[in-house]
Amino acid sequence: MSELCPCGSILNYHECCGPYILGTQVAAKPAILMRSRYCAYVEKNVDYLIATWHPDCHAQEWRESIIQGFTKTVWHGLTVIAETPGRHPDEAFVEFISRFTDADNAQITAMHERSRFLRIKEHWYYIDGIRPSLGRNDTCLCGSGKKHKKCCGR
């Protein structure tokens, strides 16, 4: 039986993010890398996450804290909003919303981020991201339909 990819595409995992995580394909675009990194979080694949962080981040130093985070987090979905070019051809941004629950809070929480990616020798790497601010009266990103201040913004 085939399994849909956790990244939210309508493709089978082995036709979508699986080849990137297995290392048989290289993500040609930052949004593809973003989706495959989300799948790596779902699958608890610390090696892929570390390999796709920009080398300047020294992500291998965070290995244990990444693994500890896996035990507390359950992922519920990813929405890629936009992929935009950066200031030069080897920089790009991906804006997304991911939904999750953690051990400390059973309510689904949404994380909104604009991630920055840099390309080195045809490989894209995640380097950092910013979280756009959300007004207290804006609709919460988690999909509850409630205002942010009455939901995840508490």
Curated annotation (Swiss-Prot):
Spans traversing the lipid bilayer: none
Entry-linked InterPro entries: NTF2-like_dom_sf, SEC_C_motif, UPF0225, YchJ-like_M
Superkingdom of origin: Bacteria
Family membership: Belongs to the UPF0225 family.
PANTHER family assigned: ADENYLATE CYCLASE-ASSOCIATED CAP C-TERMINAL DOMAIN-CONTAINING PROTEIN (PTHR33747:SF1), UPF0225 PROTEIN SCO1677 (PTHR33747)
HAMAP family registered for this protein in UniProt: UPF0225 (MF_00612)
UniProt name for this protein: UPF0225 protein YPTB2098
Originating organism: Yersinia pseudotuberculosis serotype I (strain IP32953)
